[in-house]
UniProtKB/Swiss-Prot annotation:
Its main location: secreted. Residues 1-19 form the Peptidase S1 domain. Thrombin-like snake venom serine protease. Causes the specific clotting of fibrinogen (FGA) with release of fibrinopeptide A. The aberrant fibrinogen is then incapable of being cross-linked, forming easily dispersible clots. GO terms for cellular component: extracellular region. This is Thrombin-like enzyme TL-BJ 2. Belongs to the peptidase S1 family. Snake venom subfamily. It is found in: Secreted. Expressed by the venom gland. N-glycosylated. One of its GO terms (biological process) is proteolysis. Keywords: Blood coagulation cascade activating toxin, Glycoprotein, Hemostasis impairing toxin, Hydrolase, Protease, Secreted, Serine protease, Toxin. One of its GO terms (molecular function) is toxin activity. Its EC number is 3.4.21.-.
Length: 19
């Protein structure tokens, strides 16, 4: 994902929310 740590954190939170 292009964007940086913030983007990575956002995706990680979304994955955690889904699971």
């Amino acid at each position: 994902v292009v964007g940086g740590d913030e983007c990575n954190i956002n995706e990680h939170r979304s994955l955690v929310a889904i699971f």
